Amino acid sequence: VGHSMGGETIRMLAQLLENGDADERNASRDGSISPLFTGECRHWIESITTLCTPHDGSQYDTKVYQNIGDLAQYAMGIIGSVAGANVNENNFGLDFKLDQWGLVRQPNESYASYFNRVINSKIWTQHTNDLSVYDLDVDGAAVLNGYAKAQDDIYYFSVACSNTHRDPLTGHYLPNASMNPMMLKSSTYMGRHVNYAVGHVNITPEWWENDGIVSVRSAIRPHENSTDKYNENYGVGADGKMTFKAGTKMGVWNYIEK
């Protein structure tokens, strides 16, 4: 089960377990290759269920992709709003997991200093594809969709979330009163933004309904650059509960509900 970007992560894991990676195999002919990249781990995963996953990326992430500082500040604000006011700066429990870039919190380093070092790192200005923000960008997600395909021996299910409503006058989608205040800006932007730029994923009104950071359309299944089969009418049982239905096919995205 994967929530938000976790859904993209487990899709990639399934792709690697089932098929390995040709580039890794070609680069590791001395026997040092990890079994993860050999394609010898089929049938390790029975099913994949994604919750509010941006399979097609988030149009808001695309907006802030050019300014990673805004994205990080936004994420920190959400963390703070969830943690509450009583946050111990020296024991915040936050690890950016960027060790491979040398961005490790040093002994006795304050989180403020650690955070500033991360935000001011040169890795953000290189626009590398080896960062999560690329996979969350709509164009980057399309690349991932073309690589991490639905596997024919795995069941796929998805659940979307919405916390917006349609404005009858403009047709735009607006945040509900229950929306986390930190997501009002992103939700409002997503609920009216379109982009028809040539050479990029087109953002149409179909993307407007959202949960604050992920559009319902994106959470249903991979669309952009994807050949995955799908059933968008899988639904729930008569009792309103998720029920595994007879005849459910593997290798097919089954959309449950929002």
Feature annotation, model-predicted:
Residues V1-G2, L51:
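Short beta-strand immediately N-terminal to the catalytic nucleophile in serine-hydrolase-like folds
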Residues G2, G6, I10:
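Gly/Ala-rich beta-loop-alpha elbow adjacent to hydrolase catalytic centers
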Residues M12-L16:
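Active-site signature of alpha/beta-hydrolase-fold catalytic machinery across serine-
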Residues L17-D21:
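Active-site catalytic pocket residues across diverse enzymes, especially alpha/beta-hydrolases
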Residues D23-E24, D30-K258:
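Helical cap/lid subdomain of alpha/beta-hydrolase-fold lipid enzymes
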